[in-house]
């Protein structure tokens, strides 16, 4: 996994950890990563193959 910093509209920085939780095949047969985003230990979003790799 790796970390990045995002900037909120109120100028408060939050460290977000992106965790690769595997891969799955997209509609066209490609292997695409499935990742989860966490900030302060709270899951922000679970990205699907429809959002990653296109």
Curated annotation (Swiss-Prot):
Cofactor entry: Zn(2+)
Signal peptide range in chain numbering: none
Tissues in which the UniProt entry reports expression: Expressed by the venom gland.
Keyword Transport among UniProt keywords: no
Recorded GO MF terms: 5'-nucleotidase activity; metal ion binding; nucleotide binding
Membrane topology field: Lipid-anchor; GPI-anchor
Enzyme Commission number, as recorded: 3.1.3.5
Residues bearing glycans: 46
The record's account of how the chain is modified after translation: Venom 5'-nucleotidases (or a part thereof) may be released into the venom via exosome-like vesicles. They may be attached via a GPI anchor to the membrane of these vesicles. Soluble forms of 5'-nucleotidase might be released by cleavage of the ectodomain in the exosome-like vesicles or venom gland cells.
Subcellular location: Membrane
Domain of life: Eukaryota
Annotated Gene Ontology cellular component terms: side of membrane
InterPro entries noted in UniProt: 5'-Nucleotdase_CS (IPR006146)
Similarity comment: family membership: Belongs to the 5'-nucleotidase family.
Its job: Hydrolyzes nucleotides into nucleosides. Snake venom 5'-nucleotidases are widely distributed among venomous snake taxa, but there is a lack of information about their biological activities. They have been shown to inhibit platelet aggregation. This effect may be due to the liberation of inhibitory AMP or adenosine by its action on ADP released upon initiation of aggregation. Venom 5'-nucleotidases are also known to synergistically act in vivo with other toxins like ADPases, phospholipases, and disintegrins to exert a more pronounced anti-coagulant effect.
Name recorded for this polypeptide: Snake venom 5'-nucleotidase
Taxonomic source organism: Gloydius blomhoffii blomhoffii (Japanese mamushi)
